[in-house]
Regions:
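Alpha-helical interaction segments
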Residues: 7-9, 30, 57
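Low-complexity, intrinsically disordered/propeptide-like segments
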Residues: 9-11, 17, 106
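A short, surface-exposed interaction/processing loop segment used at functional sites
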Residues: 28-33, 38-48, 107-132
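Short, non-transmembrane alpha-helical segments in secretory-pathway proteins
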Residues: 27-28, 36, 45-79
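Exposed beta-strand-loop-beta-strand "reactive/processing" segments of non-cytosolic proteins
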Residues: 27-30, 75-113, 118
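N-terminal Sec-pathway targeting helices
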Residues: 1-12
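Short, aromatic- and cysteine-enriched interfacial helices/patches
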Residues: 1, 24-25
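Hydrophobic alpha-helical membrane-insertion segments, chiefly the h-region
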Residues: 14-24
Length: 132
C-alpha cells in the first residue's frame, strides 16, 4: 500500500473519530445559555426549563412592571433602586454603564445588605442592561 493511501486512511479515521467523540460527548445542543447581558436564552429547543431560568424570567417581568408603575406615576427615572422582585434588586443605571454605576453607594440597599442575591439593571427606558 502506498504511503499516500495510508496517510489518507489515517486522516479519514481521525476525522470520523473526532465526529464520533464530538457527538457522543459534545453535550446537549438544546440548552439554555446566558447572553452578554446575563439573560438566559434558548439555545436550540430545550425540552425543559430549569428553575433558575424560570426565576429569572419572572424577575424580568416583575422588573418591567415596576418600571412601568414608576413611569405611570410620572416619577422621574434616574439612577435609583426601584425595589425587589424575588431574589433580585431592580436598579436603574446609565446606558452605557459609567463608573458612577459601579459605586457601592449607588447599588440597591437590599443587594448591599444581602437581602437579595442578584440584581437586574435597567436603563432609563426600561431595557435590561445587565443581570448579575
Amino acid at each position: 500500500m502506498k504511503k499516500s493511501h495510508l496517510f489518507l486512511i489515517i486522516v479519514a479515521v481521525l476525522i470520523i473519530g473526532w465526529f464520533f467523540v464530538r457527538f457522543l460527548f459534545g453535550g446537549n445542543e438544546d440548552s439554555w445559555i446566558k447572553d452578554s447581558r446575563g439573560v438566559w436564552v434558548k439555545h436550540g429547543n430545550p425540552s425543559e426549563t430549569p428553575d433558575s431560568v424560570n426565576e429569572q424570567q419572572v424577575a424580568i417581568l416583575c422588573a418591567e412592571n415596576l418600571y412601568e408603575s414608576f413611569t405611570i406615576l410620572t416619577v422621574e427615572i434616574s439612577s435609583q433602586c426601584l425595589g425587589t422582585c424575588g431574589d433580585y434588586a431592580i436598579d436603574i443605571v446609565h446606558a452605557p454603564r459609567t463608573e458612577e454605576d459601579n459605586l457601592i453607594e449607588n447599588q440597591c440597599e437590599d443587594y448591599r445588605s444581602g437581602n437579595v442575591s442578584h440584581f437586574i439593571e435597567l436603563d432609563k427606558e426600561g431595557n435590561v442592561v445587565r443581570i448579575v
